[in-house]
């Protein structure tokens, strides 16, 4: 909503400065978004007279002008300024607008300087209206009347120094879509005296010859009409044109400008028909299928029964409450007019506007609701303006429907102010505030009766009245009161899955990976490659064709990001994402997952090249990433099992079957997968490989058993030096190293403090179907140093246990 300061003062008698008015508007809920003060922009521009204009010696289309800007020399003689001008209307005696060097020209976004044009010095500029951004006219420089005072400031003389205020209205404040309503609120906030003159009815001189029929009162609760004969339409007066141009509206003619003025001044949209172009009487009805209307915007709209229209005997003439028709529009030949003031269904106006794609000032106000009691007074006010500006004789009013709404009264306990806002406002102040806002307060006890004005349809209850009082008193007066916390929460603030999500992010970031955040939607092709693509996961209205399905995995998005980086020269990436994936349309099919992707030399040992050599990422890096997530999320490390593609059920097809594995607890609870992505999948995704990745389902990690809280035991540092023994076992190639480690650990958990794999060998000296796995076993004595016999005994048990569980034998 835009308006000028002078326009506001038409309704508010105030001497308050602009800054204070703007601050108060924001404080009372009418947020000021922008103030355009053209007086500062136009300050350097002055009125000047062209004393002489001669042909430029070196250019056919330029003239050298001597300009009188009102300045004088030390002797009191006029001091003329030389300006080179290319405007076709530059001539001797012309009064125009002059800009001296150093002036910023808004229409060209340049700052003037003293220049030389084709060998002739120019010390300023004569300006066109387009260069000042006051109109689109750029055919010549501005021509001012002969009596314009030379040397005076142009903005002040032309009335362009009026600041334009733009406020952001909330949808409930339809009463402030007019300057009149804004002034009312400011008067309640002690910013001045509200001007609310009585609108006197205009006496009709003859019956209105056009009758009105409302077929559906739910679409049109009220409709008022009046004819004015013998009008003379033409340009509107200067004051009205300035009002409209100041807020960005283009003056058209007096009749149309009056309706636009009423829309912004009193929040009362109107429409004016050329009465001679209307055939018969008017009917407010639903449009019929296939009916069309060429509206005032020049577009042809095809209508249906959901659209409310104003029709005559010939057909549709107007889209009710939104836009009039071109055929019955007013022009300079119009002599008889029909002025319409009506009430429309807010819901129907909004639906019709959206369906037809029309955003008009009338729609903006009608879909929020207008003052029903101002329907007829608005018609009277518009009639008087038409008669003052265009002349003519008015008819009597024709009113159809119920124009006046029922009275609304609220029983308002004054204690509600203290209860809801924690401030004390005396009854005298309550009466003053509500009275200035248009409410009527009756009674003097603890409970008063408040009559709601017709223009405040948003006020429905006691809390709304408290809000009205508080916003005028000042929201800054409401004390800060903390909520009563009661007992401290006993349960953790974060849920288990929230805690796991946070820990997973930290663990992967600590491993040098960079977090990515992708859409939860991917293309159908990507979804099918990663086990999705079912119809129940397809979006009914996707925002793009490549975002059509809910993602079954986080990896497609990471692959796309990795390839995008590679295309820009950053091939070595280490990425991760933590987010939701979807395996079905039920709540039980939605999981929180953590996934990561490595490429090139972005291994877990570090990203980028190094003087000591750089190994490329492999499946073991992806495994380490997955295990880091599981450890951070609290997965039981001793229970984790690695299963190959042949051992795990439903192994995903997007992984390389020989270079990947599943992580599970038992045969049925698969926590995730790691390894190299299948080359076929990468080809489908147009991504360069190899890519190593993992995905862990955080929801499937079993909850740790709750144990009674107890103090940690005293730290016992071993008094004796540990002993390390190395073993190399020959086993089948299908045997997992983890099985050998587990077998060694199970020999004696009190003595065996650690088992690690330090070598795996396949090749010369080893059968083709065998491999050598070397482990280091750490033995920690507790109460005394081991003897050689005791160490050999434990070593024998380790060899026997490994042979029993894996069929392996010591390498000779």
UniProtKB/Swiss-Prot annotation:
Keywords: Aminoacyl-tRNA synthetase, ATP-binding, Cytoplasm, Ligase, Magnesium, Metal-binding, Nucleotide-binding, Protein biosynthesis, RNA-binding, tRNA-binding. One of its GO terms (molecular function) is ATP binding. It catalyses: tRNA(Phe) + L-phenylalanine + ATP = L-phenylalanyl-tRNA(Phe) + AMP + diphosphate + H(+). SUPFAM superfamilies: Anticodon-binding domain of PheRS, Class II aaRS and biotin synthetases, Nucleic acid-binding proteins, PheT/TilS domain, Putative DNA-binding domain. It comes from the Bacteria. Its cofactor is Mg(2+). The keyword tRNA-binding applies. Pfam families: B3_4, B5, FDX-ACB, tRNA_bind, tRNA_synthFbeta. Its main location: cytoplasm. Residues 405-480 form the B5 domain. Mg(2+) binds at residues 458, 464, 467-468. It is found in: Cytoplasm. Its EC number is 6.1.1.20. GO terms for biological process: phenylalanyl-tRNA aminoacylation. Binds 2 magnesium ions per tetramer. PANTHER family: PHENYLALANINE--TRNA LIGASE BETA SUBUNIT, PHENYLALANYL-TRNA SYNTHETASE BETA CHAIN AND LEUCINE-RICH REPEAT-CONTAINING PROTEIN 47. NCBIfam families: pheT_bact. This is Phenylalanine--tRNA ligase beta subunit. It comes from Nitrobacter winogradskyi (strain ATCC 25391 / DSM 10237 / CIP 104748 / NCIMB 11846 / Nb-255). The gene is pheT.
